[in-house]
Amino acid sequence: MIDKITCFKLNWYDCGLCCAEDMVQEEITVYRNNNLMVFKELNGYGVVCSCEIIHIESDKITKFFDFLEQTCDEWESDYKVAVCDGSEWKVRMWHSSHKVKTVCGTVEYPPNGKKIEKHIRSFIEDGKSLIEPKLFGCG
């Protein structure tokens, strides 16, 4: 049985000075089997302040996960740079074997990170959504 990525989650965190009521986290989750993406904004208390679900065409989901499986295997676990810019990102990928790969960073993209952003932004555009997520926060 081939081990496939079944779920991709990207969290962006604002680690700067802010009030607990401020939006300090964005979470994007893309599900392979359900053909959908869930976008959430959370405040400093961890309370979901907004949530949007976007349905994605099956062929686009397949293309996205095939791309991840081809490129993310060589990722290191840490792309943090010793810079205080006040933000951090974390990617988690769940596999059909129940393995979870976790990768984190700050001001630099992981390899092919810009292409991942392009896929996600196309899902948002195709879903006619107005959300503008930070994603990796590197742009």
Annotate the PLM regions.
Residues A20-Y45:
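Short, flexible N-terminal segments of the mature chain
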Residues M1-A20, G46-G139:
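Short, well-ordered, aromatic-rich surface patches in folded extracellular/luminal domains
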